[in-house]
Amino acid sequence: MNSNEDIHEERIEVPRTPHQTQPEKDSDRIALRDEISVPEGDEKAYSDEKVEMATTNASSNFGSNESAKDGESIGAFSNPHEALMQSKLREESQSKTILPSDDLSQQLETEESKVEEALKRITSPPLPPRADCIEESASALKSSLPPVLAGNKNDQAPLDRPQLPPRQVVNAETLHLKAPHGNATPSKSPTSAVGNSSSSTPPTLPPRRIEDPLDLAAQKHFLASTFKRNMLFYKSEDNSIKCDLDKNILNLKEDSKKINNNEIPEEVSSFWLKVIGDYQNILINDIETLHFQLSRGIPAAYRLVVWQLVSYAKSKSFDPIYETYLTEMAPFDVQEFENQLKMMDEVPSEYVKRISNVLKAYLLFDPECEFSTDIAYIINMILDVCEEEANAFGLLVRLMKVYGLRLLFLPSASEIDILCYKFDRLVEEFYPEIHNHMVEKGVRSSMFLPGFFTTLFQKKLPTEIQPRIGDMVFLEGIDSIMRILATLLSNSRDHLLKMGFDDMLELLKSGLLDAYIKQNDGTRGDTLLSNECMDKLLQDSMMKVAITPKTMKKYSSEYEEIHRLDNEKEVQYKSITEKNLHLQKHVRKLENDYTSLNREHVTIANELVKNRLNIESVLNENNGYKLQILDLKKKLDSEKKKQVLGVYVPNDLKKDLEETMKKNTQVMDENLKLQDRISELERLIEEIKTANKNGTLFEYSNSKNNPLGAGWSGFKKVFK
């Protein structure tokens, strides 16, 4: 059930409209409500509303004495309606006695139902939007109310009337008026005039995201970021390699306990033993101490163990690889390289062959990496720490592959440009005067900076200090070297600001260390003072130059964003160049094809000319033949005409031919008979001759009994 205060709140909200300052219109509204039929149970609610309307109209007069009395209490509220409501509730609470809990609950229920019924029947002008009102509830309430009755035109508010401030919800908890505790039944949640209910249940918060302490440390310290990168490399390896690395790490931890640390202070020795025992825990809980101890250098007795532990460089797999590459042919002139090493003051003579072996093995291991004498300085630093060449090879592989140093020795060497940009931004942020002077004189970091990174600053530092650079690189990464250069620039600030292009470039290339030693009361000839100056330089660079991995990452993102368009243009240019080369090859091919086709065309054209000439000759010959044929046809026609005119052919030629053929047949038969007779007579003549010769008498015998003259009679008939 609602409390008594909620009832007063609902009653006050009903007449609170922009027309409260017009008594005539309020009276019209009261009269209009009186005309509406009201149930008997709601008469009290309407009478209370009339009283409240009159009270509101009276309070709207600014010159009333009552408002002057309550000026202080009303002034405490930013909204005058809230002040009026507060004063009215305070008066009613003083005049009324507190009812028992059961009676109070019943009365509250009754009053709430009356107020709800009255609100349904009351027609009021639209109120200004409330700050805590929900749009859906307001639209629902507006649709449920009856239409507003038209009033008198003279009652309309003037156009220059100020708007009232937004209404605020005032509930029992705000006024500190609560129902008495006891056996009272639980009351309903208070309902506002627009129908939205207040809820005491707070919204459920999303689960809190707990950041990894190592990730948080990796944003602020190079120590943690480098360890995190090495951990990612470790997790990416095969299980067999992981087992080998884990086994060797345990061996390193056991070997570290056997190291003779008598010459090392106990505090320093115990700290580095803790680092070796649980490096990740030190990074999370005591990274500042680790950074401080690193600025003073890792003790020489623990240096190799720490390097191999942090970089995961202790692996048995490097031994057979190194031995295999030693037997192969080097990708460079070994003799010439060794002669160059002998000329270097920083390289001891006993390291020449060992440096050559390690460099040969690595270049065979990583063929993409180009040969450079600067790598010899890095190998020399590693050999100062470890005696075995295989261990030096493993450290060099990790330094190149995992720490990204190989990117400086690739043919493109794009990483150098990124490092130069990072250094420029670092100088611009920490030493803007030096940066502006360098830009003004045209000196760019790419003119002097690459040599420091490719040699890891080994070319300029004394031999005793060189392993300290290895401490920084293996534990913090390559970006940590920028601290040294930034410290040297800061130390030579006054000299740099007075120099021109040539002098400044010469100082930046080779004179920064000399200037630092000279300024700190040391000389190159005094080795002790020089080492002390270099030690101070490293400490100052690590403790005073505050750069973070987050800053370096921001610089890298800036570089990528700046050069993104350039890279896109370069990629586009390369693609266009490749396409152009392809098109040029295609053009050459087309030209060759065109040349061959042109030759074929010339040959075919020549043949065509010859064929045309032959065709002309054939056509001429053909025309001659045609003329000859025409002449022959004419002659033939003339001959035919002559034969037709000169010869008479009778009509019964066929019959004559048949008769002639028959006669010819008969003649032929007779001819055959005569031929036979001639043959017989010739035979007879021969017999007669033979008989005469023999002197015998010839006797003629005719077997056919034909007279000798019978045949001649037939012959005569033929020729009749």
Swiss-Prot record:
There is a cross-link at K498 (Glycyl lysine isopeptide (Lys-Gly) (interchain with G-Cter in SUMO)). Residues 572-696 form a coiled coil. PROSITE patterns: TBC_RABGAP. GO terms for molecular function: GTPase activator activity. Pfam families: RabGap-TBC_2. Residues 297-477 form the Rab-GAP TBC domain. The modification Phosphoserine is found at S37, S73, S139. It is found in: Cytoplasm; Bud; Bud neck. Residues 54-66, 95-108, 184-196 have a biased composition (Polar residues). Residues 1-52, 111-120 have a biased composition (Basic and acidic residues). GO terms for cellular component: cellular bud; cellular bud neck; cellular bud tip; cytoplasm; Golgi-associated vesicle; incipient cellular bud site; mitochondrion; plasma membrane. One of its GO terms (biological process) is protein transport. The modification N-acetylmethionine is found at M1. It comes from the Eukaryota. The keyword Phosphoprotein applies. The modification Phosphothreonine is found at T17. Keywords: Acetylation, Coiled coil, Cytoplasm, ER-Golgi transport, Exocytosis, GTPase activation, Isopeptide bond, Phosphoprotein, Protein transport, Transport, Ubl conjugation. InterPro entries: Rab-GAP-TBC_dom, Rab-GAP_TBC_sf, Rab_GAP_TBC_domain. Present with 2010 molecules/cell in log phase SD medium. Belongs to the GYP5 family. Interacts with GYP5 and RVS167. Is part of SEC4-containing complexes. Probable GTPase-activating protein which stimulates the GTP hydrolysis rate by GYP5 of YPT1 and SEC4. Involved in ER to Golgi trafficking and polarized exocytosis. This is Probable GTPase-activating protein GYL1. The gene is GYL1.
